[in-house]
């Protein structure tokens, strides 16, 4: 080891801790003042322009409704245009001044440029960009039959946020706008059976934290890390080991396991409220924060917990028989599941065997 790094190893750790001890009280005070001001003076979204990707269902749909209640002008982006039309009508009844629907695929760079350009042509400016589109998977990395679907996971979960951001930056800069990105709790929590998804979301978190430093205060960035929320993913929409995107009950049960699933509307309300108050991070539900402490201080215990919950014999056996809700530790699963998912579960388990 060279002399310089040897000296830095001796000096930097104690000096850094000493500086933190002196700086923390002042930093905590300023943060408290900042929090109070944000509560009082939240951003008024009336008449402002908001683009929302992945707006055809789940969190994206509910985020659209939350902005509609704040009387914003909306641009709804997704591949399923027929779904966007019905969401547009509801958004109008909730208070949205104007709603533009654009069918586009965020994995295609030209589509991302197109919906940014169409937004500017329609409204003349852009205030908020909400990058929400995403796709999960539920298989162990070693279970993948080939690598054909790997790139698509990165395309939709990482590039699907980066492409719109690239084309929107000049317009957001002119309005001192804001980027809101759904990075998911898996961006920092290593959930088993989702290695590719976790990696993509971790890249999202790192990208936007770095971008925040690069652009300074010209554009604000809110990174949302929601946990299990009722959505297409918690209803069983995953990429399979073969690279196909399907709705399947079995992987949903293996993936979600005994975790409680929160309501989408409440999650969206928290994200939009946090963004309008200028929060750098929005975490929902808050109880997931305890896992961050585990990750930092006792990572071995976190690893053991996940193996117990997601990789043991009971889950593997139960998922094959569609009976995960009966395995030990998850017997009351339906009691902590939103109504929409309870109904889905009931329909799937009450269907006649001839249809299976």
Swiss-Prot record:
Residues holding substrate? 184
- State the membrane topology: Single-pass type II membrane protein
Q: In which tissues is it expressed?
A: Expressed in megagametophytes (at protein level).
Name the active site residues. 197 (proton acceptor)
GO CC terms, sorted: cytosol; lipid droplet; membrane
One Pfam short name: adh_short
Known EC number: 1.1.1.146, 1.1.1.62
Q: Where in the cell is it found?
A: Lipid droplet; Membrane
The parts of the chain that form a coiled coil are none
Q: What are the GO MF terms of this UniProt record?
A: 11-beta-hydroxysteroid dehydrogenase (NADP+) activity; estradiol 17-beta-dehydrogenase [NAD(P)+] activity
Keyword list, A-Z: Lipid droplet, Membrane, NADP, Oxidoreductase, Signal-anchor, Transmembrane, Transmembrane helix
Q: Which Gene3D superfamilies match?
A: NAD(P)-binding Rossmann-like Domain
Principal localization? other
Q: Which reaction does it catalyse?
A: an 11beta-hydroxysteroid + NADP(+) = an 11-oxosteroid + NADPH + H(+); corticosterone + NADP(+) = 11-dehydrocorticosterone + NADPH + H(+); 17beta-estradiol + NADP(+) = estrone + NADPH + H(+)
Positions with a binding annotation for NADP(+): 54-85, 197-201
Q: Which residues cross the membrane?
A: 10-30
Q: Which PANTHER family match?
A: DEHYDROGENASE_REDUCTASE SDR FAMILY PROTEIN 7-LIKE, RETINOL DEHYDROGENASE-RELATED
- Function of the protein: Has dehydrogenase activity against corticosterone (11 beta-hydroxysteroid) and estradiol (17 beta-hydroxysteroid) in the presence of NADP(+). May be involved in signal transduction regulated by various sterols.
Q: What is known of its domains?
A: The proline-knob motif may be involved in the targeting to oil bodies.
Tell me what this protein is called: 11-beta-hydroxysteroid dehydrogenase
The organism is Pinus massoniana (Chinese red pine)
Organism classification, top ranks?
Answer: Eukaryota, Viridiplantae, Streptophyta, Embryophyta, Tracheophyta
